[in-house]
Amino acid sequence: MQKPRYALVAYLKNPAGEFVENLRRELHPDLPHLAAHLTILPPRPLQGSEDSAVQVLERICGNEEPFEVTLGDVETFVPVTPTVYIRVDSGASHMSELHSKLNTEALSFKEEWPYIPHLTIVKMSAEAPAQTAFQMARERWCHYSGSRRILLERLTFVREDIRDGALNCWVDLASVVLGRSLVSR
């Protein structure tokens, strides 16, 4: 049986997040629903228990103040992966610092690629559909008139669980508020 993976995300429950969720459904209607989010720690196995990971999150995030990020332009990770995303402009260095601080102890993991603060729009099956999705997403995002600023104050620790015999469902485990300790579990 495959080990579950864990991640730390900041959900976007605002007009920008709704825009991305609607765009994702349009670009790839077969994908299961995935809430719009910024990834602080990409998926990884734990180097210990869930409890020890939550303790690390509580300790480190409790000492971090909430901060604002601004969403930038639509970009793609092609040819590395067929992923279309919105780059984080202002606040990206703060996200990177938080990522580095949290990549320790039970959450420590050598990631395959360098950490790039971003909001994933969609991951396609291959490069050609990703390029098409990129063009469409870039055009739509240029016409988005809502706020591109996001206050990061609450993060969510999630686990990939099995549904229909495959690891493909992310479950919220704990909510962590920056500047304070764990809120719920």
What are the functions of these language-model segments?
Residues 1-185:
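Histidine-dependent nucleotide/RNA phosphoesterase domain, centered on the 2H-phosphoesterase fold
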